[in-house]
């Protein structure tokens, strides 16, 4: 077993490294030189019908609603896991916010630095790299090969093995990816009831959208006395969230935290390109006109959303799931009181806007070197893939809790290990199935679940399911995905390797400086030409070294 003491240098590095979604490198690790002795002792054979106990750590989710008497520590899902697969899960700790949020990441950083890890947990790409170098996690190659079912192995290879490769170092599987689809577009969401009220046409260009935002702010269609044009929250950089600016930036052909073609056969960093400066110039102009909440830089998504729910903002950018969030203000007392519609990203020029996307996984399930039963994590993964794709009636407990019926409680979020379909044909299937009410078209459990919710809304059984229609119905968000695929409008990050040495050392500082100057520019606290100084500083403070390392990787992995 490894030496229990980490060097002071490593501890300081782990404590200092930022792990929140705005500072952790979103590129994905692939083969790289691992630390030595990464293979832990082989797990002891577990006698059949013996329950094994393993620990993990959790982050609370605001969309999870517990049945009476249940908690994160004691609930129907944990009980079912112990009964069905003989794995008793305990939580070492539970904190507020998602597992990419600051509270969870700060707690996990300290757990890593003090060598106080649970048996298994979810790590970011940067954390995965650090944990390998610190010799704190197990090589899962043999355990995965032995305990993963054929279905699990096939499920995680549907992308040709890219995501599994990203968790593999020198041929050793160090982290099992929380797989997902790379097709995660951003949309611009607009209050269409306000468009009708003010006799405004639907937007076709970025210029149209800005005019709509100006009119919403000036005319105050919500009658509140104070309206803004665009909802923005302090985590504006989040590419798969809502109330951010990534979709807006993409409309200027600017991309956040991506390595993109430099036109010379290499890669360059997106944050420092001229397109970013032009997008920031436009945002600064919007801020000066009063189109953006002056307090956005200190408001999280929920706080900024109060302005949306209170009829003060009618435009925002967000992922396809955004209507589930908007429903909090859009549906009241069994009636839809706010009408929203998604639009594909709008462009500032004649070239269609691409929506940026990544590899499809930003999280890895890892097992502590001290864990006695690494196979438990694989068993949990096997179980999830079964119950999330083709559950029996009894296994619906994993999705709905004891009732085994849809009630909006989101019990599936209690599963401690997850993996999602790397492909996604919801856009090709759901809008047509819902429009024609043809269940025979449905191919996956997710599609059947979404279809059922949409039907409840259409049949008048449950108006609160309005949000599912806006996601999956005709004209809903997913109906745009086939067009985006067909016209190659997903802009992929071309670097998906392990964080380079300079990224590990300098990325946090560089991203902090970026966020500081970008927010100042937007809020008109710094002139737009401060962007040029930021670019110079970025290069001097490690950006040039990072670019060199990325291009060395790119040359070897094209």
Give the label of every model feature segment.
Residues 141, 168-240, 261-307, 314-319, ...:
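Helix-loop-helix "hinge/cap" segment bordering the ligand-binding cleft or interdomain interface
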């Amino acid at each position: 077993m490894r030496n229990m003491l980490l060097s002071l240098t490593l501890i300081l590095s782990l404590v200092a490294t930022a792990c929140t979604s705005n500072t952790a490198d979103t590129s994905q690790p692939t083969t790289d030189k691992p630390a030595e002795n990464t293979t832990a002792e082989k797990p002891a054979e577990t006698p059949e019908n013996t329950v094994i106990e393993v620990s993990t750590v959790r982050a609370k989710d605001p969309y999870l609603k517990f049945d009476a008497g249940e908690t994160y520590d004691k609930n129907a899902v944990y009980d079912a896991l112990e009964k069905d697969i003989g794995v008793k899960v305990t939580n070492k700790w539970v904190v507020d916010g998602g597992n990419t949020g600051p509270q969870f990441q700060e707690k996990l950083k300290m757990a890593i630095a003090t060598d106080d890890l649970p048996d298994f947990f979810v790590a970011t790409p940067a954390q995965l790299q650090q944990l390998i170098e610190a010799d704190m996690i197990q090589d899962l190659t043999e355990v995965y090969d032995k305990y993963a079912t054929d279905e699990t192995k096939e499920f995680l290879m549907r992308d040709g093995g890219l995501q599994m490769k990203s968790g593999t170092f020198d041929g050793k599987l160090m982290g099992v990816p929380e797989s997902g689809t790379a097709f995660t577009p951003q949309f611009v969401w607009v209050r269409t009831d306000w468009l009708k009220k003010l006799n405004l046409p639907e937007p076709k260009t970025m210029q149209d959208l800005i005019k709509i935002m100006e009119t919403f702010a000036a005319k105050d269609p919500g009658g509140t006395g104070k309206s803004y044009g665009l909802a923005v929250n302090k985590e504006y950089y989040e590419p798969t969230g809502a109330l951010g600016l990534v979709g807006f930036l993409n409309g200027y052909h600017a991309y956040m935290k991506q390595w993109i073609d430099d036109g010379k056969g290499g890669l360059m960093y997106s944050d420092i390109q001229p397109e970013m400066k032009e997008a920031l110039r436009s945002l600064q102009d919007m801020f000066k006109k009063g189109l953006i909440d002056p307090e956005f830089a200190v408001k999280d998504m929920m706080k900024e959303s109060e302005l949306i729910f209170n009829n003060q903002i009618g435009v925002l950018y967000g992922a396809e799931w955004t209507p589930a969030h908007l429903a909090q203000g859009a549906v009241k007392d069994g009636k839809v009181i706010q009408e929203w519609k998604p639009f594909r990203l709008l462009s500032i020029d004649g070239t269609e806007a691409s929506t940026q996307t990544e590899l499809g996984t930003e999280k890895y399930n890892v097992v502590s070197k001290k864990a006695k039963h690494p196979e438990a994590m694989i068993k949990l993964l096997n179980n999830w893939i079964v119950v999330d794709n083709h559950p029996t009636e009894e296994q619906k407990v994993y999705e709905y809790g004891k009732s085994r019926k849809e009630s909006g409680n989101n019990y599936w979020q209690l599963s401690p290990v997850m993996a999602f379909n790397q492909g996604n044909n919801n856009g090709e299937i759901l809008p047509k199935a819902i429009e024609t009410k043809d269940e025979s078209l449905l191919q996956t459990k997710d599609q059947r679940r979404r279809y059922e919710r949409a039907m409840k809304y259409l049949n008048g059984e449950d108006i609160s399911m309005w949000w599912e229609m806006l996601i999956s119905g005709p004209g809903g968000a997913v109906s745009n995905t086939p067009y985006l695929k067909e016209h190659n409008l997903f802009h992929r990050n071309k670097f998906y390797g392990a964080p380079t040495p300079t990224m590990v050392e300098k990325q946090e500082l560089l991203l902090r400086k970026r966020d500081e100057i970008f927010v100042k520019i937007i809020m008109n606290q710094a002139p737009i030409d401060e962007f040029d100084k930021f670019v110079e500083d970025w290069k001097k403070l490690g950006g040039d070294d990072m670019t060199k390392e990325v291009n060395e990787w790119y040359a070897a992995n094209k």
